[in-house]
Amino acid sequence: MVDRRNLLKAGLVAGILPLGSLASAARAAEPLQIHRAVYDSRFATGRAFAAEAQARGWTTAAIEGDVTQLWYHQLNLRWREGPAPIAGVTQENSLFVLERLAWDAGMRVTTRAALPHEPLVSWLIAPPARRIRA
């Protein structure tokens, strides 16, 4: 059930991700397209994030802590073609695994924020900003 508390937390999460997206997009000089919005469906905050992501037109992917199926059936296939940014609200251990897998696709965690009073973090995995030489 989505109550006022979880709705406010989802707003906080939704507010965090665009800042990272805008900063990355400004550095890359092109809009950042989110390939997947990953959320842990065991948590109301994760489900609220998924609803917000769907409202933005993002494709969502639910997990229950384990990212194996997501990796094997979706991300691995797409990341073989090249980088595809993903955003999410998961537990830290799920992010840890996704972060390591993203390295092989040339991506890094570019935004990470712990959610207050939750065992969750919001994050963005995307290609790192291009370095500008002076």
Features from the language model and the residues they span:
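Extracytoplasmic/lumenal soluble domains of exported proteins with redox or metal-associated functions
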Residues: 26-134
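N-terminal secretory signal peptides and thylakoid transit peptides that target proteins
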Residues: 1-15
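C-terminal segment of classical bacterial N-terminal signal peptides
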Residues: 19-24
